[in-house]
UniProtKB/Swiss-Prot annotation:
It comes from Pseudothermotoga lettingae (strain ATCC BAA-301 / DSM 14385 / NBRC 107922 / TMO). PANTHER family: TRIFUNCTIONAL PURINE BIOSYNTHETIC PROTEIN ADENOSINE-3, TRIFUNCTIONAL PURINE BIOSYNTHETIC PROTEIN ADENOSINE-3-RELATED. Its EC number is 6.3.3.1. This is Phosphoribosylformylglycinamidine cyclo-ligase. NCBIfam families: purM (TIGR00878). Pathway: Purine metabolism; IMP biosynthesis via de novo pathway; 5-amino-1-(5-phospho-D-ribosyl)imidazole from N(2)-formyl-N(1)-(5-phospho-D-ribosyl)glycinamide: step 2/2. Keywords: ATP-binding, Cytoplasm, Ligase, Nucleotide-binding, Purine biosynthesis. It comes from the Bacteria. It catalyses: 2-formamido-N(1)-(5-O-phospho-beta-D-ribosyl)acetamidine + ATP = 5-amino-1-(5-phospho-beta-D-ribosyl)imidazole + ADP + phosphate + H(+). The keyword Nucleotide-binding applies. One of its GO terms (molecular function) is ATP binding. The lineage of its organism: Bacteria, Thermotogati, Thermotogota, Thermotogae, Thermotogales. The gene is purM.
Amino acid sequence: MGFTYKDSGVDIDAADLSVQMIKRYARQTHIDGVLGDIGNFGAFFQLDGSLRQPVLVSGADGVGTKLKVAFMMDKHDTVGIDCVAMCVNDILVHGARPLFFLDYIAVGKLIPEKISQIVKGIAEGCTQAGCALIGGETAQMPDMYKEEEYDLAGFAVGVVEREKLLDGSKIKQRDAVIGLASSGLHSNGFSLVRKVLLGKMKVDEYISDLKKTLGEELLTPTKIYVRTVLDVLNDKIHGMAHITGGGLLENLPRILPEGLEFRIDKNSWEVPVIFKIIQRLGKIDSKEMYRTFNMGIGFVMVVERDEVENLLRKLNELGQNAWVIGDIVPGEKGVII
């Protein structure tokens, strides 16, 4: 008997079983507008007819080397939340409400139970963001990845009325900068984290300062800000930023008009313990920390000064810790910390 596709490392039966598992989780995320089910060649979504000038906003991202920690712990049910968060928080910056999400999973060996755990996390992330998981791709690539490893990326599409689209152009001098607390490291800087921490500690080591194991801290899912931010969004909010790779120093200038810069007071919030541990053990310069990690601020809103008290009150009522962390001053499209 000749070779089969399975002999080369690609198991179609396992793929079929995975699709059936994925359908169950995907259906749990369905919202108005979803047409059809997982398994078609394309996925369908019908826009709300009440939108006057809808603008679609899209974003794509991955989880990066945070996945290495998931491999080490053999825990795969939270990285999907990270994947959704990285995408929906990006499009949220522009005032967009996420509508639907698609995932891409590339594996060395397809194990349906592992895929099921990954997609369970993706579905949970979609539920938190109020969007639907409507499709994706699971690619078996036996010579590209080790059998126990995979890569994970996603694609989010949202909608905003054209007149409500935020791009930072309304930001002006004396606007206040509100920082929303992160849940931890989120999904950035893990190559440095692994170099600094995992050479000295084990993922199952209990860290008294963290009150949990190192692995539990590192795998804490990225916070999804969608429902909170959409609840408080109004015309006095002039710009927003998702603090991802590059930290405050690299992400904040992306939304600034010419002739302005951010002035950030790093003493206005308490930097979480995990960042202090990384900085101490790695002997990392403060500037490097602020251009690599979120340092406890996962999302930023730039608002009119007379809106600060009202916005902070609303965020607090929604259970979101937030602080005034700076203001907008004349400058060269940079960040002063």
